[in-house]
Curated annotation (Swiss-Prot):
Family membership noted in the UniProt record: Belongs to the [NiFe]/[NiFeSe] hydrogenase large subunit family.
Function per UniProt: This enzyme recycles the H(2) produced by nitrogenase to increase the production of ATP and to protect nitrogenase against inhibition or damage by O(2) under carbon- or phosphate-limited conditions.
Enzyme class: oxidoreductase
Source organism per UniProt: Cupriavidus necator (strain ATCC 17699 / DSM 428 / KCTC 22496 / NCIMB 10442 / H16 / Stanier 337)
Subcellular location: Cell membrane
One cellular-component annotation, GO: plasma membrane
Official protein name in the record: Uptake hydrogenase large subunit
Pfam families registered for this protein in UniProt: NiFeSe_Hases
Gene3D superfamilies registered for this protein in UniProt: Cytochrome-c3 Hydrogenase, chain B
Gene name, Swiss-Prot/TrEMBL: hoxG
Amino acid sequence: MSAYATQGFNLDDRGRRIVVDPVTRIEGHMRCEVNVDANNVIRNAVSTGTMWRGLEVILKGRDPRDAWAFVERICGVCTGCHALASVRAVENALDIRIPKNAHLIREIMAKTLQVHDHAVHFYHLHALDWVDVMSALKADPKRTSELQQLVSPAHPLSSAGYFRDIQNRLKRFVESGQLGPFMNGYWGSKAYVLPPEANLMAVTHYLEALDLQKEWVKIHTIFGGKNPHPNYLVGGVPCAINLDGIGAASAPVNMERLSFVKARIDEIIEFNKNVYVPDVLAIGTLYKQAGWLYGGGLAATNVLDYGEYPNVAYNKSTDQLPGGAILNGNWDEVFPVDPRDSQQVQEFVSHSWYKYADESVGLHPWDGVTEPNYVLGANTKGTRTRIEQIDESAKYSWIKSPRWRGHAMEVGPLSRYILAYAHARSGNKYAERPKEQLEYSAQMINSAIPKALGLPETQYTLKQLLPSTIGRTLARALESQYCGEMMHSDWHDLVANIRAGDTATANVDKWDPATWPLQAKGVGTVAAPRGALGHWIRIKDGRIENYQCVVPTTWNGSPRDYKGQIGAFEASLMNTPMVNPEQPVEILRTLHSFDPCLACSTHVMSAEGQELTTVKVR
């Protein structure tokens, strides 16, 4: 490949090669390779999906009413979003509208997933890319208490004694030699910039979040029977309502259980307000003060989402996180996105391990083909079963390359918030709350927090702050906060509707396949925790003729396309300086901001390919 320019980036594969394999993700496993120059700045990035999903093939010929139960197993963390996309796709194909109660219950379940997933992502999968756990042992508990009260004065757990107790527990844990999730971190790396007190505060909240998250998912067990993988139903939700029912034999949804749901929603709201959002604002401020605003990639230019959380069911114009597409960083123009339009969403495979008749042409998901074609490029180092270095000039990933009108796009909470901000600036009242959150965050990061900490104030605009690893992490926290607030309204609407006498939870008018047309096609979209999720289905003679999923990591983790355009993962790493390539904190920090999650092994390689060191990636 050597060097070429695309999307405003100058790619150059000369220089030292670093291989991260695997950086796991929910839909399989991901590998990442980068080249760094003499100054340890990333000049080339290659993202590889190393595992074939293949569920689309499994679904062919099956009953479309069962599809949700299969596709839900794509993911065990963002549990439920694939089921929701699937039932929406089938309902769209068969023109089924669900009852109001079912809509509100689905909304509560979807937002529960969002807040749970975002909290687990930040505190347990991503925070340690920002937080030096060992540094927390050096913290002054009194100063930590003062810091807590500066950034979040309403949080009740903020005494010096509380932080001293957590610090002592951490010290005993470290001295035991059994570090568990803290094993093999890059503790002491100069890539970490937080003072000891901020590290102790963050570790403390890591433990608080661990306790709370297990309670929040019980909302799924009430409405969906279990978690992970709660039950869904084409036409509604599989739970009956009886407000006056009591005991185990009563209908699953009664006032006792609804009160339990309300208590969890209140917990979520308080945690987001007093812990999650303040933590991200404080950490983001301190890294911004250190000049670390890297990782923006495609977020600075091209973002996409389908829109979610309608204020009025089946009315996309009332989406409280409105969708669309922004190109070339122009926040003054939002293009409408229609997932049914064959000229808008297309998947390419010129650099993917799949086969099309003509690989210079993209296919709309309704016409998608999932035929594997595992071939390695001539410059690949290693073997078919043990690749040492990818040849990105050839096919190099099990992920296809989705494009919107030919453009590579970033999806996720950051994309949703950039779009919401753009919509609100143009007068969309339903997007006003995200705009308020963003403007408050900018004021806190630029002025309020630096002033409270005795640091110089800054004047960064949202357009400078948001397209970054910090911005991507902040958007998740703000979305979690917003979802908690919307859940509060959903709960009150649900109870009011039931008390008005409506107990319907399913529309079964078209449950019998005899009522279906001989052929139908539909699409279901969801604002999944990691980004824009779409399921496309074709139904023929009562069976699935074709099924395609385009998941968030397909968009973000996509390889190059036939024009050489890089995907969001690859773009986000470009031009990032590394303190020490043998401890690639910066690579993990940015990749984890997309939430590829979970533990994996990292191998750091020299330009000649010999291994320098082996480390564990959280």
